[in-house]
């Protein structure tokens, strides 16, 4: 926001910019994005008469953390400390928020840097969690590689786990590990390899 936009509470420009990013995206990564961020943005899109953005998938790091790990807290800040990844910048407390409402340029600049830091933190946390996400987006679908590709991260650097199989009620499948994100995958062909891998659930 510019100082003038902050003072007049005019958020239309940044809502239009956000809509454009959503409309271009294939995948959005967010922490609590499914329950909060996406719906919050949708409300603003509706307010300004914008249509629903074109289809995209959401990878929610909060959902991954809740499903896979018995940690005392699941906030982005806690996960950053727990995983020893770069922590987002301090927003400066309530004074920064008050300054933003008053159109103070320094406060607005601080908030921009804080949010950029948030993105860096989220990116690093997602890198650490994506190998655990068995209900997530199939990244292999966005990859033109004809080799066996990891569904979690899109890497074709996968290795067979010798003598290890995944079983369904009627079949067994060769198991692989992605050397990029650590995900465990299986072939989609009975007792054999294949160029298409699926998640082991």
Show which residues each predicted segment covers:
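Short metal-binding segments enriched for Cys and/or His
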Residues: 174-200
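Short linker/helix segments within small regulatory modules
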Residues: 163-175
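Short Cys/His-rich "knuckle" micro-motifs
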Residues: 159-165, 188-192
């Amino acid at each position: 926001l510019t100082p003038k936009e902050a003072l007049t509470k005019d958020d239309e420009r940044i809502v239009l910019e956000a809509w454009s990013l959503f409309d271009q995206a294939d995948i959005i990564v967010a922490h609590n994005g499914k329950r909060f961020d996406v719906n919050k943005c949708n409300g603003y899109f509706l307010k300004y008469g914008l249509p629903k953005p074109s289809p995209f998938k959401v990878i929610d790091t909060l959902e991954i953390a809740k499903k896979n790990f018995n940690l005392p807290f699941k906030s982005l800040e806690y996960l950053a400390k727990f995983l020893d990844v770069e922590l987002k910048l301090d927003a400066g407390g309530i004074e920064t928020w008050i300054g933003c409402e008053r159109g103070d340029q320094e406060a607005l600049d601080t908030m921009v840097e804080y949010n950029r830091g948030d993105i860096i933190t989220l990116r690093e946390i997602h890198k650490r969690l994506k190998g655990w996400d068995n209900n997530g987006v199939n990244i292999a679908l966005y990859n033109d590689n004809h080799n066996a590709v990891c569904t979690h991260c899109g890497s074709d650097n996968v290795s067979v786990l010798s003598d290890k199989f995944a079983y369904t009620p009627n079949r067994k499948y060769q198991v692989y590990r992605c050397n990029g994100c650590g995900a465990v995958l299986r072939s989609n062909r009975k007792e054999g390899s294949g160029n298409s891998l699926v998640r082991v659930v």
